[in-house]
Amino acid sequence: MNLTEDCMVFEDVAIYFSQEEWGILNDAQRHLHSNVMLENFALLSSVGCWHGAKDEEVPSKQCVSVRVLQVTIPKPALSTLKAQPCKMCSSILKDILHLAEHDGTHPEQGLYTCAAEHDLHQKEQIREKLTRSDEWRPSFVNHSAHVGERNFTCTQGGKDFTASSDLLQQQVLNSGWKLYRDTQDGEAFQGEQNDFNSSQGGKDFCHQHGLFEHQKTHNGERPYEFSECGELFRYNSNLIKYQQNHAGERPYEGTEYGKTFIRKSNLVQHQKIHSEGFLSKRSDPIEHQEILSRPTPYECTQCGKAFLTQAHLVGHQKTHTGEQPYECNKCGKFFMYNSKLIRHQKVHTGERRYECSECGKLFMDSFTLGRHQRVHTGERPFECSICGKFFSHRSTLNMHQRVHAGKRLYKCSECGKAFSLKHNVVQHLKIHTGERPYECTECEKAFVRKSHLVQHQKIHTDAFSKRSDLIQHKRIDIRPRPYTCSECGKAFLTQAHLVGHQKIHTGERPYECTQCAKAFVRKSHLVQHEKIHTDAFSKRSDLIQHKRIDLRPRPYVCSECGKAFLTQAHLDGHQKIQTGERRYECNECGKFFLDSYKLVIHQRIHTGEKPYKCSKCGKFFRYRCTLSRHQKVHTGERPYECSECGKFFRDSYKLIIHQRVHTGEKPYECSNCGKFLRYRSTFIKHHKVCTGEKPHECSKCRELFRTKSSLIIHQQSHTGESPFKLRECGKDFNKCNTGQRQKTHTGERSYECGESSKVFKYNSSLIKHQIIHTGKRP
């Protein structure tokens, strides 16, 4: 008997459907039918079909069972197999899948698409590839029919499979071809191995599961719900990560500082910080050095930069020509590279598939996610070769290095001022154009920058404009103070604080310095004082300030005074002081300024602009610092305490000035009479007395005055104006001390003598009275 009578061809195992029957099947049934036919066809193609093989030598055989199919398989030693699958079988496969009428319509279309109307049509194309290319022919080396064995082996990877369909899927992965396509993306992907590229565009996937998962981005489906808070997720993996965040679970702990992480990969990345010479990417140093040592034969004729490949050079040259060939079909924006267009298009679709495992923030691409994760790991792989400072991103390093080089590539076309960064010159140009695009909805004030608007809007709320103001505000202690001083009425939290305070009234100073015999009320004051006699710092703030001394080399030296600077920009700013260069002139008074921002602040004097409003009382201020100082009046905040007398102050500089009373310091010396004065304001007034200077002249009578306030009071004599009037008696006063004069009507006597309990209206009267008890004249 002829052996070919026991052998099967594809017609023997093919399952046919009529047009009507095919229309009844749903998508899942059609996919199942296609997969079964594809598996059977692939198996027959691998062993050779027996159409027209009657005249050929029939080899000895062994049989393998696949589902219900008995296929005769020749021994591998024989060379009688056909080089290509049978064209007749290929035609039968097309007829079965009802695709013959579409032959040649789209010869390069992919196997599966997201759109249902293209599903069957694109299946035909992958099968044509199977019939034309040896690359798709599975190769079998173990042909045993024992159940459970892995009878199909991939020749490229050596991996074994139990079914030929699994082998076919693996060979698809090895080839890099993507059989599943989403036509809704509108993205065209190019590559040597991606032969199934739809003319309509579409994203490709190796697995059908990947296509289904991707399609959730189009329909907005989020099937995975967290039971605790009801948060929905598109992927199960994202739900698992979120659950770890919600529970605070951080199973991976670093050995250096005990920092914990949700994912092991984040821990590994973080540990690179503690190792010397870590790289920014996950590659070993030897491989990194090999990359750096590769020849770069393709050189740019414009800037001399060299590249590894011709493609990299072509891409780089677009930066010189300004060519932007890739256009977004949504907003019309152009891009230099296709990858940037693809990334930009995700802005329109809202697709953010990459989630940070630490904070749950979503990103459009893995590159941006990788950059973001450096915030959590603390990784700073880019080091400045000049000052040794580390940066998280290369772009930040490049900007920083311009400071050392003194490069100011971007110049203002109006005034010629140069800037290191492009966005700085864009912001600067708004000064010349007067453009203020950011307007406050509360007071309609406009700003050049959005950050200025955000800062300004805090004025209209109860929020603090600065973090330091919030910290100072939190120091206000609102706890009850039950311990009251019988001498001055001051209250304290504890009995110990009260006892320490009462030493001020008794004059007791039990703690004496062994070096200079100076005595103190409190032991802490003595300890603080003794640091003066050592090399230690008296205050922690002084130590912190000392640590800020920069020991880095300062290569930029001023030729006038010899002072050295870290950067060229700092030297340029310093030299303006030496040369007296003041390019910014006030149009009102002709005064010149070194910087434009100082001119802007100065011009508020002429315009009367007071942009900073107190949200409590509605008062306006010219400067932000003045507003911050004023707001402490409403909060009652006095965080700065004098260590000598316990008095509190709103500002640190007022405390410093006050402490001169205890130290006896008088830093201001009059050059005319040699007198020393404690305060600058007193010194200015005194200096005018010594020199006879009277700069303020009355326009009516030409009388001169030393101070502007004196001139204003004098001018009221010409106008007859008396701006200060008492409500009780209607009497007018030129000066604003109406509060003191009201005591005449109210009978208030707020100043009491501690010795005789006698009370007085004015503090000056009390001081005069106390001379009776002490015998001392102030």
From Swiss-Prot:
An annotated GO cellular component: nucleus
Domain of life, source organism: Eukaryota
Position of the signal peptide: none
Keywords associated with the record: Acetylation, DNA-binding, Isopeptide bond, Metal-binding, Nucleus, Repeat, Transcription, Transcription regulation, Ubl conjugation, Zinc, Zinc-finger
Any one Gene Ontology BP term: regulation of transcription by RNA polymerase II
Record domain KRAB: where: 8-101
InterPro entries: KRAB (IPR001909), KRAB_dom_sf (IPR036051), Znf-C2H2_ZIC1-5/GLI1-3-like (IPR056436), Znf_C2H2_sf (IPR036236), Znf_C2H2_type (IPR013087)
Sites of the Glycyl lysine isopeptide (Lys-Gly) (interchain with G-Cter in SUMO2) crosslink: K761, K768
N6-acetyllysine sites (modified residues): K466, K539
GO MF assignments: DNA-binding transcription factor activity, RNA polymerase II-specific; RNA polymerase II transcription regulatory region sequence-specific DNA binding; zinc ion binding
Annotated compartments: Nucleus
Role: May be involved in transcriptional regulation.
Family: Belongs to the krueppel C2H2-type zinc-finger protein family.
Protein name: Zinc finger protein 749
Provenance organism: Homo sapiens
